[in-house]
């Protein structure tokens, strides 16, 4: 019969944890896996040769951070020292990503309240503006007149409504805007109803991205297209999303 040991002891013996207290914390937080099975009892005994892995914590406070990180990497965008404006901040995934990438400050704007992650609410670099509708964003509502980088992740509204309201806050001479394009909120009511909220037609998705890109270039003569890409992560309901980047001349 194979020897068996407590799960917390196995983690320490395999150097997956430094102490039994740390091992217990990993187990109780649900991060210890055997294949796809989550092991949550520190004192339960298992065979010495059981396969164990530690699930790494997410890099950012929400999935949105991974979306922005992919765009920054693809287009080699440096946010070090940048002053960020996050429109539709919600939990703060974009803000968290930007700060970890070196942004100096972040102003978070959201029409809701009590959504920003506690980690970001406590960060002195972050200004949290709640119950503020970006469609009617006045300069007096913000701590700065312009920003080095503006990121946008909004739902249930078209970017054609948000972009004109936000573009004035992008700094001239190289300011950056990155917007998450969500086809389900850009398509016509007929297409959305037909698709039951999840746009699966790739031709329609691509056409929507092209339409938003053309809109931005038409409305903002001082905009230069950086590029666009598929989001590495789909929306909550499986919707394909895109990231679109512009610079202000």
Where are these regions (language model features)?
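A basic, amphipathic helix-loop patch mediating RNA/tRNA/ribosome contacts
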Residues: 1-50
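Glycine-rich helix-loop-beta junction characteristic of Rossmann-like nucleotide cofactor-binding loops
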Residues: 16, 73-80, 143
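Conserved class I S-adenosyl-L-methionine
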Residues: 80-90
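Conserved SAM-binding loop of SAM-dependent methyltransferases across substrates and taxa
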Residues: 91-102
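S-adenosyl-L-methionine
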Residues: 107-161
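A short glycine-rich, Lys/Arg-flanked "PGG" loop and its adjoining helix->strand segment in the class I
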Residues: 160-178
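Short, glycine-/aromatic-enriched active-site segment of Class I SAM-dependent methyltransferases
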Residues: 183-201
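Core SAM-dependent methyltransferase catalytic element
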Residues: 233-249
